[in-house]
Amino acid sequence: MVKLAKAGKTHGEAKKMAPPPKEVEEDSEDEEMSEDEDDSSGEEEVVIPQKKGKKATTTPAKKVVVSQTKKAAVPTPAKKAAVTPGKKAVATPAKKNITPAKVIPTPGKKGAAQAKALVPTPGKKGAATPAKGAKNGKNAKKEDSDEDEDEEDEDDSDEDEDDEEEDEFEPPIVKGVKPAKAAPAAPASEDEEDDEDEDDEEDDDEEEEDDSEEEVMEITTAKGKKTPAKVVPMKAKSVAEEEDDEEEDEDDEDEDDEEEDDEDDDEEEEEEEPVKAAPGKRKKEMTKQKEAPEAKKQKVEGSEPTTPFNLFIGNLNPNKSVNELKFAISELFAKNDLAVVDVRTGTNRKFGYVDFESAEDLEKALELTGLKVFGNEIKLEKPKGRDSKKVRAARTLLAKNLSFNITEDELKEVFEDAMEIRLVSQDGKSKGIAYIEFKSEADAEKNLEEKQGAEIDGRSVSLYYTGEKGQRQERTGKTSTWSGESKTLVLSNLSYSATKETLEEVFEKATFIKVPQNPHGKPKGYAFIEFASFEDAKEALNSCNKMEIEGRTIRLELQGSNSRSQPSKTLFVKGLSEDTTEETLKESFEGSVRARIVTDRETGSSKGFGFVDFNSEEDAKAAKEAMEDGEIDGNKVTLDWAKPKGEGGFGGRGGGRGGFGGRGGGRGGRGGFGGRGRGGFGGRGGFRGGRGGGGDFKPQGKKTKFE
């Protein structure tokens, strides 16, 4: 290796000085002076190669690393020349540029000052020179392949011409790997043919430099965009390979490695766009994944039940086909005298639904749970889907004002055709509310009309629709038939001595009369009178209202809030606590003249409702608005208009009970300032506010302390 370096010394010096100053040929004999000139020429030539700078961006990669490593060990310029000649190694300009090219990597390894100065220029010419290096060397075949590669690169570079001027330093890293192929063989051929071909090559160099500049610049820019980071390690690897100039196989391996690196770089460039598009693809994939389970759900739930009487059947054998399962399930129920309308199975065939003709068949079918179908014990239960809830709500009634001691059996005696009764309780105590489910919607409507106001355990029950009907009922205030026109009158202030026969004489067109009684068989002071049509009920209301029966003036109202749609001087208050007194009731409506609570004659206990009289309809209206949705003694009361029994007093003062410091407590009460009662100072309740109202305004809500 040392001998080769010496031989390359003399020859390399002559080559370096040859191109610009032809004095190199004359001074080739003196080696020491050429070394000095090489150093000086390297500095001067830095300016010259800048024009060709973009050409060699890629080539110097391997050469640069090798030159530096050898520079540190052997300062002679001979080795610099030996490694650098890529393709144009023989050409003198190539050698001149080679010396600076070696300095390119120096910023990391050697002096930083030289590296900065030479970075743009050296690498650029190094790439251009290799083009001729292979012609004089033994690797003529390699030169041809390199030229082909350059042509291919030129084609690729045409696409990237717009980006030529970007990143001058990055390009050398990628392309510098290829020209090194001919590097080891080039110096050997130069020793034999340099003297003969130098003149010719110099001329050729000058002619081709102009053309090669454009070609190389295009090539380097095309690959210069690629990330240099991956190619850098390959340079270090090439250093070890280039030290052994006699092994051509290693050069071939370098070529393969370089091609792989180039491919990797190309892939990186191509991957930049997909990375941006990836989120979109991922979103599509995510939506597809999300849509999949929904599609399954639709397949399972897609078929609507043919009847409202359906059961869920689980633990089916999924190894059987749909037809086999349907046939087996139908046969099972047919053997038990149950007619099946339809059988629907899920997509996984592990469960399904069975539709029956009637509620009786459904109840009988529930008893068959645990029987085997294709070796599996089936599970039968009522479905809990949204559709079944709507169906059940349509045929279910809500019963209110029930006795707290009422039982399901007692309700069953009243609602004989009820399919299910559910009492609502809290902390083990009944809330006086129950849900009564019937077999059909028609049965529910029939019971609402017939049993509305029925006395159960000493209390008059109030019935309401549930579900969508119940919501409409609340908006319209109708508690009677679904048509909204009540055929029933509610008679209040009835004498306790009055009987059903007495009322039949007064209301001749009545089709049904009910006089509720207490457990002791005594009348409660009110009655329900049903007529054949709404017109008959309305006629009786107009003709018999305020009629005196057995010493008392009766009050008639159409059942439901429609009967009390017109304001009067009297409010009907329902939902009172058993502990509420007339004094408390009157104080709750401060503008009231009088208040009375309906009590049982025998026991003297409250019936849960009462009446409050005012001096005028305006005062009553203001009080009603103030106490709407209000509470009295912890019970939420319901207000409605009633026909006054007597004349009022001296006028009301507005807001309801409560307010700051009132029964409503610190939160404003029901009638105070800002309270739910909407009464009080400036409230809808009117004049001066409720008992607790009108005081200092305290903002509602949580307090925030700042330390």
Curated annotation (Swiss-Prot):
PTM text: Some glutamate residues are glycylated by TTLL8. This modification occurs exclusively on glutamate residues and results in a glycine chain on the gamma-carboxyl group. Symmetrically methylated by PRMT5.
Q: Disordered: where is this region?
A: 1-308, 639-707
Q: Show the GO MF annotations.
A: DNA topoisomerase binding; identical protein binding; insulin receptor substrate binding; mRNA 5'-UTR binding; PH domain binding; RNA binding; telomeric DNA binding
Q: Does the keyword Nucleus apply?
A: yes
Residue(s) carrying Phosphoserine: 28, 34, 40-41, 67, 145, 157, 189, 212, 303, 358, 403, 460, 462, 577, 588, 616
Q: Which residues carry this modification: N6-acetyllysine?
A: 9, 15-16, 96, 102, 109, 116, 124, 320, 350, 379, 400, 429, 446, 469, 478, 514, 522, 569, 574, 643
* Primary localization class, coarse: nucleus
Tell me the GO BP annotations in alphabetical order.
Answer: angiogenesis; cellular response to epidermal growth factor stimulus; cellular response to leukemia inhibitory factor; negative regulation of insulin receptor signaling pathway; negative regulation of translation; positive regulation of transcription by RNA polymerase II; positive regulation of transcription of nucleolar large rRNA by RNA polymerase I
Enumerate the InterPro entries for this protein. Answer: Nucleolin_RRM1, Nucleolin_RRM2, Nucleolin_RRM3, Nucleolin_RRM4, Nucleotide-bd_a/b_plait_sf, RBD_domain_sf, RRM_dom
> Mind telling me what this protein is named?
Nucleolin
Provenance organism: Mus musculus (Mouse)
